[in-house]
Amino acid sequence: DQNCDIGNITSQCEMQHQNCDDANGCNTIIEECKTSMVERCQNQEFESASGSTTLGPQ
């Protein structure tokens, strides 16, 4: 059960990329990180809503 709170996701992505030295690209990288994490969260919520008991792709 991941923390799908957007503030949580933002801080996780910023921590992951805190050593990023591409001044122009870091924000883009962080945005992409947030987007993919949000999508993963939504997919997990969808799977649990459909009553699936298996984790991950089969």
UniProtKB/Swiss-Prot annotation:
Expression across tissues: Produced by the albumen gland of the egg cordons.
GO cellular component terms, semicolon-separated: extracellular region
Described function: Water-borne pheromone that attract the marine mollusk Aplysia into breeding aggregations and coordinate male and female reproductive behavior within the aggregation.
Top-level division of the source organism's lineage: Eukaryota
GO BP terms in the entry: sexual reproduction
SUPFAM superfamilies according to UniProt: Mollusk pheromone (SSF90183)
Subcellular location: Secreted
Name of the protein described by the UniProt record: Attractin
Organism this protein belongs to: Aplysia fasciata
Signal peptide from the UniProt entry: none
Disulfide pairings: 4-41, 13-33, 20-26
Keyword Glycoprotein part of the UniProt annotation: yes
InterPro entries associated with the record: Attractin, Attractin_sf
